[in-house]
Amino acid sequence: MKSYRWLTLSAALGITVLEAWLFTAASASASQIDSHSTDNAADSGQALYSTYCGACHQANGEGMAGAFPPLKGSGVVNRADATKHIDIVLGGLQGVRASGVTYSNAMPAFAATLSDAEIAAIIDYERAAWGNHGSLIGPAQVASERARLN
């Protein structure tokens, strides 16, 4: 009887160790996937920013004096509610005044050029880069705002 008891306890211990190992392996894989997805989204946002925004707002987000406003430290970019930020990217903007400076050059509208996912990636990049701390968004939020504006 004692040998069956030890056998049962050994089997239970073995199963517990196996479950713990499988759980740890699955958690590590999920973590790697999440990290990889986040890295890809950030890379995508940075690449899209470089293509569509960087010439005017510059790679460092500081803009061009008197021509294009900075995104680094921008009130619109750092606002908790991203609606205005989305509206500007979708609809463009001209004659903006920021920090006491008027920027006369026009920003084109990207509603017809970029998808909701691309706009979200750019905005998320801008809201996280250069020390900015705006809340991040997703394609669904861009789609909702696009529908509201149409």
Residues covered by each model-derived region:
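Hydrophobic alpha-helical membrane-insertion segments, chiefly the h-region
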Residues: 15-23
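Short cysteine/histidine-rich zinc-coordinating motifs and their immediately flanking basic loops
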Residues: 65-70
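Sequence/structural segment immediately N-terminal to covalent heme-attachment motifs in c-type
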Residues: 39-64, 77-91
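N-terminal targeting and processing segments of secreted/endomembrane and organelle-targeted proteins
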Residues: 3-6, 22-26
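Electrostatic cytochrome c docking/interface patches
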Residues: 23-48, 63, 138
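A short beta-alpha structural unit
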Residues: 72-74
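Flexible coil segments in periplasmic/lumen-exposed cytochrome c-class electron-transfer proteins
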Residues: 30-36, 97, 101-150
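Bacterial N-terminal signal peptides that target proteins for export
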Residues: 2-14
